[in-house]
Curated annotation (Swiss-Prot):
EC number: 6.1.1.23
Gene Ontology molecular function terms on file: aspartate-tRNA ligase activity; aspartate-tRNA(Asn) ligase activity; ATP binding; nucleic acid binding
Binding-site list for ATP: R219, D220, E221, Q228, E498, G550, L551, D552, R553
Function (record text): Aspartyl-tRNA synthetase with relaxed tRNA specificity since it is able to aspartylate not only its cognate tRNA(Asp) but also tRNA(Asn). Reaction proceeds in two steps: L-aspartate is first activated by ATP to form Asp-AMP and then transferred to the acceptor end of tRNA(Asp/Asn).
PANTHER family attached to this UniProt entry: ASPARTATE--TRNA LIGASE, MITOCHONDRIAL (PTHR22594:SF5), ASPARTYL/LYSYL-TRNA SYNTHETASE (PTHR22594)
Annotated protein name in UniProt: Aspartate--tRNA(Asp/Asn) ligase
Family, per entry: Belongs to the class-II aminoacyl-tRNA synthetase family. Type 1 subfamily.
GO CC terms in record: cytoplasm
Keywords: Aminoacyl-tRNA synthetase, ATP-binding, Cytoplasm, Ligase, Nucleotide-binding, Protein biosynthesis
Encoding gene, per UniProt annotation: aspS
Site feature location: Important for tRNA non-discrimination: H31, G83
Species of provenance: Magnetococcus marinus (strain ATCC BAA-1437 / JCM 17883 / MC-1)
Disulfide bond residue pairs: none
Length: 607
């Protein structure tokens, strides 16, 4: 007989019915000759009972059952007695008395029990077992629901799902490409796509108006908890749109996914702040809006300070983020922190380049010598008054200061703000705090390379009010350097993590060539790498823009997990290896010869 029910679907309404169940032995217990088995499939558990008095043959077979054996059990649904009801199981009010048992497969003894706390490496080595865990099955089923919600919503909004090539040409997008050698074209290589960026733009030029794809992308970069060498994007592009159109559409997709998968209502419209505001108030371009603390800028008032550290930072000149900055972060109630705790936070900001962490404990008004700190004696009344007005500090508060290059101050105090907010439990009640960050700079100055780089990618459109600065012969006026040119780019941030990013694209050939020129990509290189795009732009390209949502990150945050590896079926380690399949691996010399390749790698010999 074929399966009639999933394990977790059997309920009191089926009492008296005969059902056929299939699944794995989760647990087996022998109580006075009666054998109880928790049978598991992807939906959950149900208790099946083998009674020697009622059905001797299946009971005899049940003596051979062990963990993870695969069985088919046919039996009658019966109500459990009052004393045996299990309120912790969905099926805890019933059990199935087995009349017929088929053992479909046996199992070797497990290297670990599925409910054991084990190392991640062991989990990844035996991923096929780890995926049987209820929490992993929940995670992947949840991911499935998100994907189906997105597809349904975008299809209903007039989007066309189009697949783009996995084998394409190498183009610079900020990270290293994964390269694939061509056997048919010796010496040439494909690249696995870092994103479908150029193809989706070409689809807009081809007139498809609204495109989407749930797509695999590849980046050969150093990994951390929220990154993988291959990852999944919810990718979309729209024609004849402005930033607001893309952001509103994206909000509707995300809001629907939260509602369907979590039953959570996300307030709309999502708050919007500019990049400049994010950096000024929070120090990071992906601020965690659950934390109400803000940074305050003291640079101007500290330019004449007697405190050398503040004065030097306030008067430091430099291009881009190399100019000086002095900021303060008020920690409400932080005056209770011990010196040891403050030293720990000082070490923490050192990770981000800060040379120290000045502080003031507010024990009373500054006019009454109520501020406790080694730096107070260097501060004049005007500076103290400015600090008080900026922070509105109260008795019991703690003030942390950053003084250095803007890049160091923003990063260190921005990260400290998040750390303090979480460790001191200063998060607001909003569990999912979304924010749009808009008007990113178009370009960033690389001080080491002495050249401009694209903040997002070379195809991002500049803000229409700032295009004039790109068109100047020298690239920009003295009063308005290129780093101040804004872009029509926008990021969606959730709880301090970027979950999506996009922009309006350049649809004018001359402007696109100018952008490449500013990035020091010459005509020959531009033609070689982007010639197909530049040609397409000349044949009636519409205004267009889009966005990509990181599916792995989004699901991780929705489930409150720490690592995206827990929402991916077969992830890689932080060394980009698969412990289960042992990929990457050596290949046969004949395969390399076919590809006209040979390895020059020489392993280190033991000394």
């Amino acid at each position: 007989m074929k399966r009639t029910h999933y394990c977790n679907d059997v309920r009191e309404s089926q009492i008296g019915e005969t059902v056929v169940l299939e699944g794995w032995i989760n647990r087996r217990r022998d109580h006075g000759g009666v054998i109880f088995v928790d049978l598991r499939d992807r939906t959950g558990l149900v208790q099946v009972v083998f009674s020697p008095e009622l059905f001797a043959e299946p009971h005899a077979q049940a003596h051979t059952l062990r963990s993870e054996y695969v069985i088919r059990a046919t039996g009658k649904v019966t109500a459990r007695s009052e004393g045996t009801i299990n309120p912790n199981m969905d099926t805890g009010r019933i059990e199935v008395v087995v009349e017929d048992l088929t053992i479909l497969n046996s199992s070797l003894p497990l290297p670990f029990q599925l409910d054991d706390e084990i190392s991640e490496n062991l989990r990844l080595q035996y991923r096929f077992l780890d995926l049987r865990r209820p929490d992993m099955q929940r995670n992947l089923m949840f991911r499935h629901r998100i994907m189906q919600s997105v597809r349904k919503h975008l299809d209903g909004s007039g989007f066309v799902e189009v697949e783009t090539p996995m084998l394409t040409r190498s183009t610079p997008e900020g990270a290293r490409d994964y390269l694939v050698p061509s056997r048919v074209n010796p010496g040439d290589f494909y690249a696995l796509p870092q994103s479908p960026q150029l193809f989706k733009q070409l689809l807009m030029m081809a007139g498809y108006d609204r495109y989407f794809q749930i797509v695999r992308c590849f980046r050969d970069e150093d990994l951390r908890a929220d990154r993988q060498p291959e990852f999944t994007q919810i990718d979309l592009e729209m024609s004849f749109v402005e930033p607001n159109d893309v952001m509103e559409l994206t909000e509707s997709v995300v809001v629907e996914a939260f509602k369907e998968a979590l039953g959570v209502s996300i307030p709309q419209p999502v708050r919007r702040i500019t990049y400049a505001e994010a950096m000024d108030k929070y120090g990071l371009d992906a601020p965690d809006m659950r934390i109400t603390m803000e940074l305050k800028d003291l640079t101007e008032v500290m330019k004449s300070s007697e405190f050398k550290v503040f004065r030097q930072a306030a008067t430091l000149e430099g291009r881009g983020n190399e100019h000086g900055l002095v900021k303060v972060l008020k920690v409400p109630g932080g005056g209770s922190l011990t010196r040891k705790q403050i030293d720990t936070y000082t070490e923490f900001v050192g990770i981000y380049g800060a040379k120290g962490l000045a502080y003031i404990k507010v024990n009373g008004p500054w006019q009454e010598d109520g501020w406790q700190s080694p730096i107070v004696k260097f501060l004049g009344d005007a500076e103290k008054q400015a600090i008080q007005e900026a922070t509105q500090a109260q008795v019991g508060d703690l003030l942390f200061f950053g003084a250095d290059k803007a890049s160091v101050v923003n990063e260190s105090l921005g990260r400290l703000r998040v750390k303090l907010g979480k460790e001191l439990e200063m998060l607001c009640d909003e569990k999912f705090a979304f924010v749009w960050v808009t008007d990113f700079p178009l370009l960033d100055w690389d001080n080491e390379a002495r050249r401009n780089t694209a903040v997002h990618h070379p195809f991002t459109a500049p803000h229409p009010d700032d295009i004039i600065y790109l068109e100047n012969a020298d690239g920009a006026s003295v009063e308005h350097p290129l780093e101040k040119v804004r872009s029509l780019a926008y990021d969606l941030v959730l709880n301090g993590t970027e979950v999506g990013g996009g922009s309006i694209r350049i649809h004018d050939t001359m402007l696109q060539r100018r952008m490449l020129e500013l990035l020091e990509i010459g005509e020959e290189e531009a033609e070689g790498k982007f010639g197909f795009l530049l040609r397409a732009l000349q044949y009636g390209a519409p205004p267009h823009g889009g966005l990509a949502l990181g599916l792995d990150r989004l699901v991780t945050l929705m489930l409150g997990l720490d690592s995206i590896r827990d929402v991916i079926a077969f992830p890689k380690t932080q060394k980009a290896t698969c412990l289960m399949t042992e990929a990457p691996s050596k290949v046969d010399g004949a395969q390399l010869k076919e590809l006209h390749l040979r390895s020059t790698f020489k392993p280190k010999t033991a000394e």
